Amino acid sequence: MRLPAGACIFNGGDRGEIALVLSGLGAFSFQDTRRRNHIFSLVPAGRLMGNVDDLTADTVSVTDMALRETEVRLVQRETFLAFLDSNPEIERSHALGVIADHESDMEGMIANFTLSARERIAALFSSLVHNLAPEADARGRYPLPFALTAVEISQIVAVARPTVSSILSDLSGRGLLVRRDHRHIVSARLFDILHDRTSRGAGPAARIVRRHRRAPSQSAEQVSLKNQKCQLSDTRTPAFFAGL
């Protein structure tokens, strides 16, 4: 099934759908009291949408949407739950993944409500590098996955598109970002403006200190992404969807 940009799956309740993203890019979002959308998590190919609230049959104010044209494979809630019930190991891995998802989702939401526009963009790029591990070139620069457009970046970080374009142009002029073949390539120096709240063993009550390392670290403040730790460790789950 192909979802056009902005289309949503039916998630939540006792008739919710679960979608395996085959291509494109999905996202989790919610609306504030002014009906503005806020994206707090990205869902790349190979990951699931609708699998969290469909576990509980709760209806929540979160929309599982296609950020761009996205191909998905849909399965009904009852079928998915029956599969988990018959595979306890996968069910446990899935539950752990849900917990990890919520942790990173909260980081993404906090970042988008507390960081400056420039820091949000740097945090998004840092998250893509950390979680999807693109290979650095000879100059220590990282090609970002997904070839995000300025419009998509503005949607993700909740910043007006002209502001995003202005920041990207400034980063390019300072040698921190290069655009090649519709793809952004970023220098690790861009991440120097981010903070590491766990640096030097800092706890929740400790003062946040600036991170001085040039290479990105796993503990950098980052916008949420369905990352590698959230991925189901058992390869039978994709096989289950392939057989539908």
What name fits each language-model region?
Residues 130-230, 240-244:
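Phosphate-/nucleic-acid-contacting segments
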Residues 18, 40, 72-73, 145, ...:
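A residue-level structural signature of the nucleotidyltransferase/glycosyltransferase Rossmann-like core
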